[in-house]
Amino acid sequence: MAIRINTATFQSDLYRSFAFPQPKPLRSPKFAMASTIGSATTKVESTKKPFTPPREVHQQVLHSMPPQKIEIFKSMEGWAENNILVHLKPVEKCWQAQDFLPDPASDGFMEQVEELRARAKEIPDDYFVVLVGDMITEEALPTYQTMLNTLDGVRDETGATLLLGLVWTRAWTAEENRHGDLLHQYLYLSGRVDMRQIQKTIQYLIGSGMDPRTENSPYLGFIYTSFQERATFISHGNTARHAKEHGDVKLAQMCGIIAADEKRHETAYTKIVEKLFEIDPDGTVLAFADMMRKKISMPAHLMYDGRDDNLFENFSAVAQRLGVYTAKDYADILEFLVGRWKVADLTGLSGEGRKAQDYVCGLAPRIRRLEERNSARAKESVNVPFSWIFDREVKL
């Protein structure tokens, strides 16, 4: 899930693409911005078509990975069976949404729903804004599987390929699908939110796709998913903590069980990148620096409800204020991945590789310093209406 920091506290280009972009009209003219290591300047186009919201789309480089590197991923097939598929659970051992929700076939269904709604009444609107944003992000799952299938060397050419890496992609999608199911059904039963506006937002988001700037490269793609899965783990873990603080232990269990899934998935994706560092350290550190220079733009950054052109920014600002996902978390994830992949210990790199190594190893402290400076200049927050909660206002 993608969240940005409060725009009142962060005004830097450093966060423009990841979850903390500056609020600006999405119908702005084209503008140029820096892109990748060794690449030319790219542009961002603002488009408006009948079935999609106003949006910014980068003119991406396509198929940037040298074709010969596809062999690296073919060689990892046997390794994936013992190191990646182990992070999936058999379907019969997986939790399902119904395990946590009132049973519509039971005589006590209505009483169970009333109990759920009574607990939900004690939870403030700003929490529901964040929970809805998390759920909408989870519900755009078709986009995420599509994104993985754009990656050269690891795409599912038939839709049912039995190569182990592609078995992972489909099974990962199936596990993730339960997350949106659970949160969607909970929110429907809670009576606290405008389900039609939420469902419109989901349709807009899936129709808009996503713009991760991964260039069909599995190097970039798996670095992206490693970052994203850890971000989602942190976010769901914090919504679980907040639900417990508001007295809803059952909702806390729902968010917590989703966070546990995200942690397993994070482990798998970080192991893939760890293997790439072992096989091709120079190419992998260049890819890591590339993604961090472009900033990780998370899946829901094209979120729209038919009304608010800055919906994602506003949702993210609420999450930042509540401490569900913050600029500090962004820096912490980067620092975690640098350590997990032992980037500082890499040797035998090219000149460009050493520059990339220095860049990623020094970036987290720079982000924290920038956060401290901008927090000191923080302006007073404003209240903004959210259609998801019947246009009630929430402080950003």
From Swiss-Prot:
One of its GO terms (biological process) is fatty acid biosynthetic process. It is found in: Plastid, Chloroplast; Plastid. Its EC number is 1.14.19.2. Pathway: Lipid metabolism; fatty acid metabolism. Its main location: plastid. Fe cation 2 binds at E176, E229, E262, H265. Fe cation 1 binds at E138, E176, H179, E262. Its cofactor is Fe(2+). It holds the Pfam family FA_desaturase_2. It is an enzyme of class 1 (oxidoreductase). Binds 2 Fe(2+) ions per subunit. It catalyses: octadecanoyl-[ACP] + 2 reduced [2Fe-2S]-[ferredoxin] + O2 + 2 H(+) = (9Z)-octadecenoyl-[ACP] + 2 oxidized [2Fe-2S]-[ferredoxin] + 2 H2O. Residues 1-33 form a transit peptide. Keywords: Chloroplast, Fatty acid biosynthesis, Fatty acid metabolism, Iron, Lipid biosynthesis, Lipid metabolism, Metal-binding, Oxidoreductase, Plastid, Transit peptide. One of its GO terms (molecular function) is stearoyl-[ACP] desaturase activity. GO terms for cellular component: chloroplast. Belongs to the fatty acid desaturase type 2 family. Homodimer. Converts stearoyl-ACP to oleoyl-ACP by introduction of a cis double bond between carbons 9 and 10 of the acyl chain. This is Stearoyl-[acyl-carrier-protein] 9-desaturase, chloroplastic.
